[in-house]
Amino acid sequence: MFGTSSSNKTISTESLSQMIYVSEEVEFGTVIFSTKDWIQPSDENDIVRATSFIANVITKALLKSQKIKENKFDVLVYLESFKIKQINYQFVKYLADILKQLFPEKLRKAVIIDPPSVFIHSYEIVKKFMDKPTRAKMSLISTKENRILYDDIMDD
C-alpha cells in the first residue's frame, strides 16, 4: 500500500511522544511537532501507527481548546536539520487525507519554523493553488524571527 523507505527502524509510541505533543505553555490547543529526531515511517504499520498517534494528539489539542470555548487547534512544526529527502510522500498524503476527514476546518494556524530552502521555494509555487483562507492559516518563519512572530501569529 505505501511502499518502503530506506530506514529499517520501527517508530515507537515513546519516540513519537517526544516529537509530537500538545504544548503545556499556551492555553490554546497547540500541537508541537519537532522533526529533530524524526524517523520516517517506512512500512504500513509505521504509517498507520504514526497517523493514529498524530490524530490522537490533535484530538487532545482540540479538547484543550474547547476548555476555552474554541473548537480549533494550532500546529508548530520545527524543521530544524530536516532534509527534504527524509519525506515519505505516501505517508504525507495518507496523513493529510486522514486529517482532512477527521478534522475538517479545525486548523486555526500552522507555523513552520526553519523550513529547508527547497521547502520555501516549493511552498511559493503550491500556495498559488491554495484558497485564500487556507493560505492565511500558514506561516513560514526562520529562527531569527521565531520569538517575535510566534506571539503575533498565534494570538491574532
Residue map of PLM features:
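SEC14/CRAL-TRIO lipid-binding/transfer domains and related phosphoinositide-recognition modules
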Residues: M1-E105, K109-D156
